[in-house]
Amino acid sequence: MTPKKMTHYQRHYHITTFGCQMNKADSERMAGILENMGFIWSEDPNQADLILYNTCTIRDNAEQKVYSYLGRQAKRKHENPDLTLIVAGCVAQQEGEQILRRVPELDLVMGPQHANRLEDLLQQVFDGNQVVATEPIHIIEDITKPRRDSTITAWVNVIYGCNERCSYCVVPNVRGVEQSRTPEAILAEMELLGKQGYKEVTLLGQNIDAYGRDLPGVTESGRHQHTLTDLLYTVHDVVGIERIRFATSHPRYFTERLIAACQELSKVCEHFHIPFQSGDNDILKAMKRGYTHEKYRQIIDKIRDYMPDASISADAIVGFPGETEEQFENTLKLVEDIGFDQLNTAAYSPRPGTPAALWDNQLSEEVKSDRLQRLNHLVAQKAAERSQRYLGRIEEVLVEDQNPKDSTQVMGRTRGNRLTFFKGDINQLKGRLIKVKITEVRAFSLTGEIV
């Protein structure tokens, strides 16, 4: 490749992010690195000199969308050879050099563990190299201020990677083993956010309640010295931060000690995202999830014992290989019994490199689509029922932005993570905690008025 010149005009960048909250946090860090290098954000990718796609490989449709976008920009690059084209994230990690066979116009292919190395990798590109960085490494601590999408709420990574081996999931292959940040580093980042005026922090991890298992130290009782529970106590009193959330939790590591801490610590919001994936024990075993539906129900019951009004959200997969109608109905029964405030649902999508993708008992797309539709109908029904409890109540809402569909309204979220709209001036209310009386409820959102 011919060396690229960092000329005066090659200064605009655009990042498109696919997938989970972890990817969004990675994109914010990479944007911060680019701006530290002198790049300027461009809302329009077609006006950018550097385009980065931060990718997701959990579902096949997300992966195909990436290649569609890449195809369009590859054509642009033939017209403008100075365009820098980057694929980051999980597709990059999984495909590695194979991506270059499909899109030889790429300058840089980098896995999620390399996000904080972006400047070094780009320097290699500007020296005329086509770079692939997917080798496993110890994640470099955050060294650049992220370009955060919000001035009110912020993501803070606390643990990277995943040690689970669910039979359907590519995450351990693409994000590597668990690597916990030190409590001191997390506390320092949150203290900075508090000084910068941020009001809410969401602590992030693929399995966040596994935090600290890889850090040294054991207590006299034999448990790990550093756990998510201990971390919540460590960061709770950061000045300026009014709310703390965490996601995503794994049922295997969700303890009563953690639940009790969430009830005790006033800044921790009463909202818990705990995927169950299936309501059938045989399917859970085939998925290698490491728990039963009875164990999952016990966790939710215990949360509601401590915090009766807690909001519960989760993830579920339908149409897993070999799933019978009866097994699917066990998932419906769990959803009916628990009553989730929100449920992210998906039809099973075979992913390369996972055991389940090789099984010969795959279900038809028609069966998976039918089951997904039936589950979604029940989810909306139960969420609407759960919403009724808010009617007439006064809720604390953190105002985040203007309602894009109604400029006379602002919007924000309750402690239970319900999106809430009400009349108000965004210039006066943004970033404030406002008491709102709920006057209208829908399945997944609320409307109210300032008290």
UniProtKB/Swiss-Prot annotation:
Sequence ranges assigned to domain TRAM in this UniProt record: 388-451
Domain of life: Bacteria
Keyword terms, alphabetized: 4Fe-4S, Cytoplasm, Iron, Iron-sulfur, Metal-binding, S-adenosyl-L-methionine, Transferase, tRNA processing
Cofactor: [4Fe-4S] cluster
E.C. number(s) listed in UniProt: 2.8.4.3
A GO term from the CC aspect: cytoplasm
Function of the protein: Catalyzes the methylthiolation of N6-(dimethylallyl)adenosine (i(6)A), leading to the formation of 2-methylthio-N6-(dimethylallyl)adenosine (ms(2)i(6)A) at position 37 in tRNAs that read codons beginning with uridine.
Name of the molecule in the record: tRNA-2-methylthio-N(6)-dimethylallyladenosine synthase
The species this protein was found in: Rippkaea orientalis (strain PCC 8801 / RF-1)
